[in-house]
Amino acid sequence: MKTEDLTAYAKQKESVEKEITSCLLSINNKMEECYSGLSDNYQDFFQNYADMLYKLEIKKEYYSLLLEETEKSDLETIQAYMMDVISTLTQELIEIKIGSSCVGGMKHLAAVLEFEAKLELLVKFTELACNIDI
């Protein structure tokens, strides 16, 4: 690779890492807001924050794993990892959609929240994967 190609490659990898780090920072900040609501009033927490916190926990797990992959891999491997996650998320969304109608109230609520979180992850991971120019 030429020097300018290596520089562009490094900048692109750095850009991907910054995007993921930014998402994790935003998630952590929102989680702190949720936890602060917990100490004030439990009823208010469950009415206004619990669903958001559940979705944030799901997203944090996926972004943390992606950041680990980004720190140790090249762009091609990162993109392949994201495509694998996209495929897995798509399959899980189908399974959640089919299975959520067959469960009780609380499990249904959890399935709906998981569906929403994973749908948002699917969109973001697809966007990130498509922005990698190899």
Set out the residue ranges of the language-model regions:
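Residue preference for a single heptad-register face of alpha-helical coiled-coils
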Residues: 8, 12-15, 41, 48, ...
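Short, charged, amphipathic alpha-helical segments
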Residues: 43-58, 106-120
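Secondary-structure edge/capping motif, primarily at the C-terminal ends of alpha-helices
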Residues: 30-45, 70, 96-103
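Intrinsic disorder/low-complexity detector
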Residues: 2-9, 66-84
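Repeat-associated, polar segments at repeat-unit boundaries in modular proteins
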Residues: 53-75, 122-133
